[in-house]
Amino acid sequence: MIANIDTSLIDWSRAQFALTAMYHWLFVPLTLGLGVIQAIMETLYYWTGNEAWKKTAQFWMKLFGVNFAIGVATGLIMEFEFGTNWSNYSWFVGDIFGAPLAIEGIVAFFMESTFIAVMFFGWEKVSKRFHLASTWLTIIGASLSALWILIANAWMQYPAGMSFNPDTVRNEMFDFWAVALSPVAMNKYFHTLLSGWIVGAGFVLGVSCWYLIKDRSRDFALRSIKVAAIFGLVASLLTAMTGDGSAYEVAQKQPMKLAAMEGLYEGGNGVGLVGIALINPEKTHYNDGVEPLLMKIEIPKMLSMLAERELDAYVPGIVNLIEGGYTLKDGTVALSAKEKIAKGQLAIQALANYRKALKAGDQQAAALHKATLDENFAYFGYGYIKDPAELIPSVGMTFYAFRIMVMLGGFFILLFLVALYLERKGKIADCRWMQWVALLSIPLGYIAGQAGWIVAEVGRQPWAIQDILPTSASISKLDPASVQTTFFLFLILFTVLLIAELRILVKAIQKGPEE
């Protein structure tokens, strides 16, 4: 592992990866959501034989194709960054992290890449049934791509199914299904997939309402609104349900992230869920005694219910997690951060001693050092932490991002519910205020998604892999100036791609569907 690394290299490497990931996530959710919607529309065409549904599906398919292509380009760049900027990470866990990504490339990506050609160019060339199957297989392939990538990400949040090999200084997978089917992975996948469906439904609803505002393609717009409103409402409700499951898993596996999400410094029994509050700017240290939240409005005991499924359950705060001493569910006493750091340093030293003993041919000493390493490996990453305060993520960023995500999630439930009601009553074509609300709401789904990823990734700092490998020990030994240069090159490239996509989408929307 790297010692005495330049902190600016860490910051710029993180910034570059965050830039790539956030730009990439501007394209992925629309692919996931719009793809399913166009497949539903083509299914309606297949069932009814109504040519109007065919033309509707073909229009949204054009927009899907543009977005899909640029999403692939940004995703490839992100995968290469693991090797260029995060070589220590790649070495330490490449055997595990690489497996889901390999499956994604070999199975899911090839699947969607194969059938997307039939989906776009197979109209009138293959049977209706085969074309419909190709459309669904393209969307299933895209969804499977997301599955394997999110399994890899979930493993970083909750490393399972692996063991550490001190001979190679690498983690090795021993239980594939523990990695692939961990509760964190499943909750993360469905929550993320469904949030993409919301983006797709919001996009279709907003664009369709624009046609109503312009008094164009009325029948097309009403057909699209019907599908988008039903699909969006179902997706919004399911997203809320999976969000509850995700919060529970965070409480079990990443309690510091949960504490940051709630701005909770002092835990207790029957803790309330903060609805609205402001972070106190005078709070500068976890144990300075300053009240962390201002103007707090909370739901009594609800955080305990979300975290432990009991109204009076104990939920630790940041101070409790740093200082330890509280009783865990298994009856043991929680270690303090200093105790974990000491155990981590012991594990790192035991690894070094083990390798020295092997080199010297002292098998007995090697066995003793390996036993010490195994006993303390759960805290291996803490050995790289110098100050317990480093274990606290950005509370302000995590706290506000979580509330933005949740509030927008509630907004979309209401938006799709009202849209569906007006559509069923035959009033949405004349409801100008609703049309404008839907149109202006298109960016909100993207904002909610970005906020969710901020909660997930900023909230788990300082860890690249929870408790095992901190971000500071994961990077490649590069010149910070080179990372700065590529950061701005990528910023320009991604911005150009985004502008190009927006221009193409706007032109296609302005042209409208074939009548």
Segments (PLM) and residue ranges:
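Membrane-interface helix-loop-helix modules in multi-pass inner-membrane proteins
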Residues: N67-L137, A154, V458-P462
